[in-house]
């Protein structure tokens, strides 16, 4: 089945039509969260159509309100509930990009979609959405989203990290409207093909994050293609435990230890583990960090970042790479005391990119880390912030 893209939609014509664009907006809606996905929706919002933007987001945490932590967004107005003011603030860059007044609240029902008559094409802006989560049936929400653009409307799927999800704003609405792949989806597929096909060598991969189970497929896929794979973040402790090393109170997926041992045996010349770690007695901003050997973390401490010796070793490796892919932070970068490893490797990747290497940063966490620590280096690195 052929995949229709934005060029096909433009060829058909968008004048007088509504276009529903699904973006990947799944970021924490708090004062510290990274706003890149909200403030930089991408080129599909500049095609001159009457655009409605949809997405899904939420707040971190659990408790009694946890079932409502995720919200699907669609249609006129702003996010109803947590993060509403944040979405309105994020609308500011939309004005600078010529997208209209995004985030403008129109009168209408507090919940659901405003079904009032749509303004004439081109007369209203790209709008931040109203919360449509909490409906008993996702199909109903999908129908209401489709109603936003009317019977002549179209649906553009531009959230690469969510295209596989069976959500109202991804799946149901696509069954109701002519649908097209957005520019960002097409670009990210092209980049991934470059990373998994013929690449310039040396080819280095940097993987972080909490769990080996989340990255197992990536490791097994790239281990036969890359020259080296750096393992950091919380996932490195399961690999260290698989070698029989003491990891203290660090995160370990016990059910993945045998898998890590197999990977280490199979790809001994490819996988690279830290030689030292930054450790602390607890995960807190005021916890005192100390550097310890990676193979002998004290029982009363947990690893929270890769150490300076590891940063030096991995920086030397990355400085010679011609192709690089980074997915996941090296430590708990949200706390400045535990962010040096992530920042150091990001600087190394940016420096190599400035000399002509091809580099890709993928994944919400590592993209956020780059944004927070290295905003001036952003133009040097191909960022796939939507790649999970």
From Swiss-Prot:
Positions with a binding annotation for ATP: 215, 303, 334, 363-366
Compositional bias ranges of the Basic residues kind: 102-136
An annotated GO BP: gluconeogenesis
Record InterPro entries: Phosphoglycerate_kinase, Phosphoglycerate_kinase_CS, Phosphoglycerate_kinase_N, Phosphoglycerate_kinase_sf
Gene3D superfamilies in the cross-refs: Phosphoglycerate kinase, N-terminal domain (3.40.50.1260)
Keyword Transferase: yes
Localisation per UniProt entry: Cytoplasm
GO MF term set: ADP binding; ATP binding; phosphoglycerate kinase activity
Binding site for substrate: 24-26, 37, 56-59, 117, 165
Pfam families: PGK
Chief location: cytoplasm
Keywords: ATP-binding, Cytoplasm, Glycolysis, Kinase, Nucleotide-binding, Transferase
Binding partners and assembly: Monomer.
Family statement drawn from the similarity comment of this UniProt entry: Belongs to the phosphoglycerate kinase family.
UniProt protein name: Phosphoglycerate kinase
Source species taxonomy: Bacteria, Bacillati, Actinomycetota, Actinomycetes, Mycobacteriales
